[in-house]
Swiss-Prot record:
Annotated Gene3D superfamilies: Metal-dependent hydrolases, Urease, subunit C, domain 1
Residue numbers binding Fe(3+): H73, H75, H243, D318
Pfam family membership, one: Amidohydro_3
Record organism: Bradyrhizobium diazoefficiens (strain JCM 10833 / BCRC 13528 / IAM 13628 / NBRC 14792 / USDA 110)
Chain's gene name: hutI
Name of the protein: Imidazolonepropionase
Enzyme class label: hydrolase
Length: 404
């Protein structure tokens, strides 16, 4: 009796992105079969049973299929609008001047605290829709603009709600240690006490976070303060991530590695020792060219060092109101190639396989292979390099999430 599937996509070219295959894992004459939302077969059409049946067969007319895209670092949920600050900066105002005038992250925190969960969801939906419209099937969303227990949890609840309102997998990260709230009066240690003793336990009890993130930087939190957050997270059974070495080298990459972090992100100032430590720990480097571009950074992340040591590299939008108002993984790939000199294969892996790796969900998505969710992006392109090469162009033909 012939095997029956829910859907079969045939007459397709596949970029499987499997790590055990060279380059993009291309299959020129490929086919994908799915059942129950999962891939059952992804491979050469010639090796697939000719008598296989399906409820629906889709002729892809020679189009390319990649895994659905993964944006592994975003701050999609927030209140307010900081476009006016962009205008001020173009007129010569510094970050410090804007902050003293009540702008910067303080303004986003104030607006986020005032917003209801429904308002946060409504403002984030267009940003999420933009990512979905370019083939994203998994999106990570951080808190970090509440800086008090109530608002941080409201941000995370809003992120979870987005996943119920759209066909997309949402992964949430608690980023309570993002900045110091105004009411802390400059006392970082006291605020970290609040994060570790009140916020994190409440977030964990509510099941609102898949991971815990921290911003370790001179303008944010120290290595010791970060370690306290990570130790608390570990005690609660939550994996960790780190905003590391963006503006200076405080040893963030090495600290992330010490705690076996899923990822260390930004990394413009990471040194050789940090890269080696990340490789040994299996911590993914998440590169964020949108922020590099938007704040006109000049120090590039050490891509050659990451290659040398075998550090896995992901790319993400870092969508946020202050330093990367970017909602395009296609543009993030072009920036990764143009600004960081990443290869086409590295860029495509960065928003598929390695993005999933950075979220700890590589066993579920990120490549085209049997057993994973049937998350696909089908493209009107002649070759996969076009996804990285072209600017301001969206060749997505169809997006498939969990087989639908």
């Amino acid at each position: 009796m012939a095997e029956r599937f829910d859907r079969i996509w045939h007459n397709a070219r596949l970029a499987t992105m499997r790590a055990d295959r060279p380059d993009l894992g291309e299959i020129e004459h490929g086919l994908i079969a799915a059942r129950g939302g999962h891939i059952v077969y992804a491979g050469a059409a010639a090796d697939f049973p000719a008598d296989a049946d399906a409820i629906k067969r889709i002729d892809c007319a020679g189009r390319w299929i990649t895994p659905g895209l993964v944006d592994c670092h975003t701050h999609l949920v927030y209140g307010g609008n900081r476009a006016h600050e962009f205008e001020l900066r173009l007129k010569g105002a510094s970050y410090e001047e804007i902050a003293r005038a009540g702008g910067g992250i303080v303004s986003t925190v104030a607006a986020t605290r005032k917003a209801s969960e429904a308002e946060l969801v409504a403002s984030a939906l267009p940003r999420l829709d933009a990512l979905i419209g370019e083939g994203a099937t998994t999106v990570e969303i951080k808190s970090g603009y509440g800086l008090d227990a109530e608002t941080e949890m409201r941000q995370l609840a809003a992120a979870r709600s987005l996943g119920r309102q759209r066909p997309v997998a949402i992964r949430t990260s608690f980023l309570g240690a993002h900045a110091l709230p105004p009411e802390a009066d400059g006392d970082k240690d006291r605020y970290i006490d609040l994060v570790c003793k009140e916020m994190l336990p409440a977030v964990a009890k509510a099941g609102l976070a898949d991971a815990v993130d921290t911003f370790m930087e001179g303008i944010a939190f120290s290595a010791g303060q970060t370690a306290r957050v990570f130790e608390t997270a570990r005690g609660l059974g939550l994996p960790v991530k780190l905003h590391a070495d963006q503006l200076s080298n405080l040893g963030g990459a090495a600290l992330a590695a010490k705690f076996s972090a899923l990822s260390a992100d930004h990394l413009e100032h990471t040194d050789e020792a940090g890269a080696a430590a990340m490789a040994k720990a299996g911590t993914v480097a998440v590169l964020l060219p949108g922020a590099f571009y938007f704040i006109r950074e000049t120090q590039k992340p050490p891509v050659e060092s990451f290659r040398k040591h075998g550090v896995h590299m992901a790319l993400a939008s870092d969508c946020n109101p202050g330093s990367s108002p970017l909602t395009s993984l296609l543009l993030a790939m072009n920036m990764g190639a143009t600004l960081f000199r990443m290869t086409v294969a590295e860029c495509l892996a960065g928003v598929t396989r390695e993005g999933a790796h950075a979220l700890g969900v590589l066993d579920e998505t990120g490549t085209l292979e049997a057993g994973k969710w049937c998350d696909l992006a089908i493209w009107d392109i002649e070759r996969p390099a076009e996804l990285v090469y072209r600017i301001g162009f969206n060749p997505l033909h169809r997006r498939v999430w969990r087989g639908q």
